[in-house]
């Protein structure tokens, strides 16, 4: 990560790993052509809760609980019927890490009260990606108001340092509106090391079914 402030530099120096994605489902309830996780091509599949818990526990032991941020991802993570249990386990093994659920937001209005109570008690952030024709900043802001939640937009690394205990926080990110163009080289002749070092997401790792990937793409 590029640190723009002294506070950010100190924050990241305290952590062994800047960012880890944990995949809760392979599939999604959208069919985006630009999906970098290839969810539209995936079969309906959820990573078993026991596997996720084992992975999170092992990561906590190896990283000595020094992970700056964890993103609970998919596919669409809210499709996983054990999402509440996964949230509790994530917070159990990473009590001080910034944890967020990355969702397209479609299922949020139908989520049970138990889900929202867990969000509040664990301090896990609900981060909604923006999609044309699916949601908007104003819609998300109004939804956050209905839930009595804090609303954030265009969050920075500084927000990772915040603790969100006993309140609901809803954020937005650019989603498909903010993604860069990722060309596929079918010939396989590109310089892998160069591409990895210059990828804007090169610090974004992925934990999935017993494997720790240095790149989120290859986990899919």
Q: How would you name each of these model-derived features?
A:
Residues 1-114:
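Conserved alpha-helical substructure of the radical SAM core
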Residues 2-4, 162, 175-177, 198-200, ...:
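Sequence contexts marking disulfide-bonded cysteines in secreted/extracellular proteins
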Residues 123-134, 153-156:
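Non-cysteine beta-strand/loop elements that form the S-adenosyl-L-methionine
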């Amino acid at each position: 990560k590029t640190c723009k402030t002294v506070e950010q530099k100190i924050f990241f120096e305290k952590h062994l790993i800047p960012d880890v994605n944990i995949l809760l489902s392979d599939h999604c309830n959208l069919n985006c052509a630009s999906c970098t996780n290839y969810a539209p091509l995936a079969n309906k599949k959820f990573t078993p809760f026991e596997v996720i818990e084992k992975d999170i526990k092992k990561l906590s032991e190896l990283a000595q609980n020094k992970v700056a941020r964890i993103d609970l991802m998919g596919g669409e993570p809210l499709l996983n019927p054990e999402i509440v249990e996964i949230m509790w386990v994530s917070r159990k093994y990473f009590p001080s890490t910034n944890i967020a659920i990355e969702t397209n937001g479609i299922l949020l209005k139908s989520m049970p009260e138990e889900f929202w109570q867990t969000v509040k008690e664990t301090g896990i952030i609900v981060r909604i990606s923006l999609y044309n024709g699916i949601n908007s900043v104003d819609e998300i802001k109004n939804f956050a108001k209905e839930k009595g939640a804090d609303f954030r937009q265009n969050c920075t690394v500084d927000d990772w340092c915040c603790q969100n205990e006993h309140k609901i926080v809803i954020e937005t990110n650019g989603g498909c509106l903010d993604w860069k163009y990722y060309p596929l080289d079918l010939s396989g002749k590109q310089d892998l090391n160069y591409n990895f070092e210059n990828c804007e997401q090169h610090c974004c790792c992925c934990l999935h079914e017993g494997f720790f990937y240095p790149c989120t793409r290859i986990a899919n």
